[in-house]
Structures are given as C-alpha cells and as structure tokens.
Amino acid sequence: MTETPNTSSEEIQTSEPSPDNELQVLQQENANLKAELQEQNDRYLMALAEAENSRKRLRKERTEMMQYAVENALMDFLPPIESMEKALGFASQTSEEVKNWAIGFQMILQQFKQIFEEKGVVEYSSKGELFNPYLHEAVEIEETTTIPEGTILEEFTKGYKIGDRPIRVAKVKVAKLPAKGNSDSNEEKE
C-alpha cells in the first residue's frame, strides 16, 4: 500500500507544471501570437496596398478613356475644318457678298481652332523637315539630287498631336536619292 501513494505523488508532481515550465509555455504562446499578429498585419498592409494600386489604376484608365474619347471626337472634326480652310482660301477671289459670308465662316473656324487649343491639340508643319515615321506617312516619293534624302517636299494633309503624341500623322511627299542603277541606265541612254 505504501507504493501506491508514492506513485500518485509522482504523478501529481509531473502533472503540475513547474513555474519555469509554465513560463516557457506562456513565452512560446506569446511568440506564436506575435508571429500570427505580424502575419495578419502584413496581410492587411498587402491588401491595403493592392486596393490603393487598384484605385490608381482605375483612375488612370478612366482618364485615358476620356482622353481617347475626346481625341476621337476631335478627329471627326478635322476633315470638315480642313475643307472649310480650303474653301475660305478661295473666298478672296469672289464677290463682296461671298467675302462677307467668308468672314463669318472664318470666325466659326477660329472657334473650332480655339477648342482644339484648349484640348491640347496642335497642328504641326512638316514641309522642309526630315521624315519621321512616327509623325509622317509617306504617300509619295520623289527622286531628286538637289534636296537631301528624307526631306519632306510637300504636305498633303496636316498632322495633329496632343503633347508629343500624334493623333493624326501628316501625309507627305518625301525626297529620295535616285537609285544608282537608274542613273547608270540614264547615262547609257545618252
């Protein structure tokens, strides 16, 4: 019988945690909770950053969509404006009555150009400039030895841009040096 009580006191001693063991367990739990809190905090900050990035991206996309919508609307006005400019160019060759009408149309044309300016649309001149495929479309090439190759000889349609970005490239005639084979065959014919 004496053995039984000894066994139970040993069991009691092992089942009751010592203050050192209890402290270690609490410290471990504390470390685990801190790590979990840090992980949750990191997730929260990541979600917050993603939400902010999404807001910025949506704001930028909305601005770009509005800009492209304005550009497309303005592009639709370019052909009639250019036609009006050409027609007004001939107004000086007509009667006084037509010249008076032309003054009114000139005012309307100026209003259109003012709207374009307010929206940041500017026309650019190409004649005499070097050909730039970003700003020009070569619709005609003329062989010449008097003008440097790549120089724009004539502008058929004006180019327009907003900032540095063209919204319509200029259609131009570009100078090109004659091919060497062509000059040899011309000399043989003579």
Curated annotation (Swiss-Prot):
It holds the Pfam family GrpE. Residues 1-21 are annotated as: Disordered. InterPro entries: GrpE, GrpE_coiled_coil, GrpE_head. It is found in: Cytoplasm. Coiled coil: none annotated. Residues 1-18 have a biased composition (Polar residues). GO terms for molecular function: adenyl-nucleotide exchange factor activity; protein homodimerization activity; protein-folding chaperone binding; unfolded protein binding. GO terms for biological process: protein folding. Its main location: cytoplasm. One of its GO terms (cellular component) is cytoplasm. CDD domains: GrpE. Keywords: Chaperone, Cytoplasm, Stress response. Gene3D superfamilies: 3.90.20.20, Head domain of nucleotide exchange factor GrpE. Participates actively in the response to hyperosmotic and heat shock by preventing the aggregation of stress-denatured proteins, in association with DnaK and GrpE. It is the nucleotide exchange factor for DnaK and may function as a thermosensor. Unfolded proteins bind initially to DnaJ; upon interaction with the DnaJ-bound protein, DnaK hydrolyzes its bound ATP, resulting in the formation of a stable complex. GrpE releases ADP from DnaK; ATP binding to DnaK triggers the release of the substrate protein, thus completing the reaction cycle. Homodimer. Belongs to the GrpE family. This is Protein GrpE. It comes from Chlamydia trachomatis serovar L2b (strain UCH-1/proctitis).
